[in-house]
Regions:
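Post-His helix in hydrolase/transferase enzymes
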Residues: 177-180
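Beta-strand-loop-alpha "switch" segments that mediate conformational coupling across diverse proteins
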Residues: 161-168
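Short, glycine-/small-residue-rich phosphate/pyrophosphate-handling segment
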Residues: 97, 110-161
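Cofactor-binding loop segments of dinucleotide-utilizing enzymes, especially the Rossmann-like FAD-
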Residues: 8, 41, 135-138, 166
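A short acidic, helix-capping loop that chelates divalent metal ions and anchors anionic groups
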Residues: 170-175
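N-terminal beta1-alpha1-beta2 submodule of the flavodoxin-like/Rossmannoid cofactor-binding fold
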Residues: 1-110, 182-246
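A generic structural signal for alpha->beta connector loops
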Residues: 33-35, 128, 168
């Protein structure tokens, strides 16, 4: 089984909670025997779709842009059995880098209009891979992912194998929460293993990955607000805060 794991976080490894959770999941996939390639999209040149439809007319199936998407990423996407779309939650949906990647898969479809089950679709030129969506957010409520979930279900339909949404994700990197973080990451690895073995992730495993961490919202909010006030007063970004105070 060939799996492409895309990480659209702009943050470097070790800082990115998207990467931390994805790394654990990929570990399980590899234990299950999958051939997994991880790609940090922040290191790739992927231009915006310009809506020219060259990929539908002049060069069917090939984008007008000669960039990393056309030369490398799109062919790998087409060759994959499963693609994991790992993105931080920005303004309640995928971040801009992931959205650009998704838009650039347009050459896999043809321009014509078909209606299936009451919905209009473009016919598939090249069958897209199955999808898994992984996202993390700072807010503690799972409800913050509702818009993203609606979007990816519309986008991938029956090709969506699993959705993994981790609220209060900053906590998994804090030493005081390491016992809970270990359980979450162990479950993420189990989810990767299950995906390879059965093309799905059990509800029990997803519940373990996404289990509530925050038991006292006021304490959680006070901790977060104290952190941000210190950053503002000291004139530090979060990464600079970490380097200074550990």
């Amino acid at each position: 089984m060939k799996i492409l794991a895309l990480n659209s976080s702009p943050r470097a490894d070790g800082v990115s909670k998207t990467a931390i959770l994805l790394d654990a999941m990929v570990k399980g996939m590899r234990e299950g025997g999958a051939d997994v390639e991880m790609i940090p999209l922040r290191k790739k040149s992927v231009k915006n779709c310009i809506g020219c439809y060259t990929c539908w007319t002049k060069t069917p199936g090939t984008c007008v842009h000669n960039d990393d998407m056309t030369r490398e990423l799109f062919p790998k996407w087409l060759e994959s059995d499963i693609v994991v779309y790992a993105t931080p939650l920005y303004h309640y949906t995928v971040n801009a880098r992931m959205k650009v990647f998704i838009e650039r898969t347009l050459p896999a479809w043809e321009p014509f209009l078909n209606r299936v089950d009451g919905r209009t679709h473009h016919p598939i030129r090249q069958k897209p891979p199955k999808a898994v969506v992984l996202s993390v957010a700072g807010f503690p409520e799972s409800s913050v992912f509702s818009f993203l979930s609606s979007y990816v279900n519309m986008l991938f339909g029956k090709g969506l194998l699993a959705e993994i949404y981790r609220p209060a994700s900053e906590i998994i990197a804090l030493p005081v929460f390491q016992d809970k973080a270990k359980g979450i990451l162990t479950a993420a690895a189990q989810g990767g293993l299950e995906l390879v073995q059965s093309m799905k992730i059990s509800k029990q495993t997803i519940d373990q990955i996404t289990a509530p961490i925050v038991e006292d919202f006021d304490a959680f909010a006070n901790m977060a607000n104290s952190f941000w006030n210190t950053c503002i007063q000291e004139g530090l970004t979060p990464s600079e805060f970490q380097k200074k105070f550990g």
